[in-house]
């Protein structure tokens, strides 16, 4: 008989870091909302998106999905002992406001909010207007 060996999963257990301050990058498009929380040097601490939480199709672009993504990323960052974040928001999507509120409601202190949406200096032609 072959001896049984204990099997562990292929994932390494992430060491708990002690990161006090960070930056929450909220990327909100018309199709999805991605929340990435980094330390001050720009190294990723936690992230979440509406798609990674199981929302598919047009449900990804809802403010509710962005709210859950913000909560999930903030809770994961708080497990690394993060207390305060500066928020940078990029994009025109419907999940901008609700993701900011969710990060604040999860218990992280917000020190600053900045809009870093790229604005073209008359670059490429934009997509045609939607007919709703």
Curated annotation (Swiss-Prot):
Q: Does the keyword Ribosomal protein apply?
A: yes
Name a single GO cellular component. ribonucleoprotein complex
What is one process in the GO biological process aspect for this record?
translation
Named from the GO MF annotations, one term is: structural constituent of ribosome
Q: Which InterPro entries match?
A: Ribosomal_uS11, Ribosomal_uS11_bac-type, Ribosomal_uS11_CS, Ribosomal_uS11_sf
Asked if the keyword rRNA-binding belongs to this entry, the reply reads: yes
Which key words are in the record? Ribonucleoprotein, Ribosomal protein, RNA-binding, rRNA-binding
* Cited HAMAP family: Ribosomal_uS11
Question: Which NCBIfam families does the record cross-reference, listed alphabetically?
Answer: PRK05309.1, uS11_bact
Q: Which family does it belong to?
A: Belongs to the universal ribosomal protein uS11 family.
How does it associate, per the subunit comment?
Part of the 30S ribosomal subunit. Interacts with proteins S7 and S18. Binds to IF-3.
**Which function does this protein serve?**
Located on the platform of the 30S subunit, it bridges several disparate RNA helices of the 16S rRNA. Forms part of the Shine-Dalgarno cleft in the 70S ribosome.
**Protein name (Swiss-Prot/TrEMBL):** Small ribosomal subunit protein uS11
Q: Please report the organism this UniProt entry assigns to the protein.
A: Oenococcus oeni (strain ATCC BAA-331 / PSU-1)
Per the UniProt record, the lineage of the source organism begins with:
Bacteria, Bacillati, Bacillota, Bacilli, Lactobacillales
Gene name of the encoded protein: rpsK
């Amino acid at each position: 008989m072959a001896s049984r060996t204990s099997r562990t999963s292929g994932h390494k257990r992430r060491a708990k870091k002690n990161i006090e301050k960070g930056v929450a990058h909220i990327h909100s498009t018309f199709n999805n909302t991605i929340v990435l929380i980094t330390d001050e040097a720009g190294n990723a601490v936690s992230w979440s998106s509406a798609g990674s939480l199981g929302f598919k199709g047009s449900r990804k672009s809802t403010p509710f999905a962005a709210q859950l993504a913000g909560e999930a990323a903030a809770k994961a960052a708080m497990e690394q002992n993060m207390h305060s974040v500066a928020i940078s928001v990029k994009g025109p999507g419907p999940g901008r406001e609700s993701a900011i509120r969710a990060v604040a409601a999860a218990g992280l202190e917000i020190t600053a909010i900045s809009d870093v949406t790229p604005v073209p200096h008359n670059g490429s032609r934009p997509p045609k207007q939607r007919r709703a």
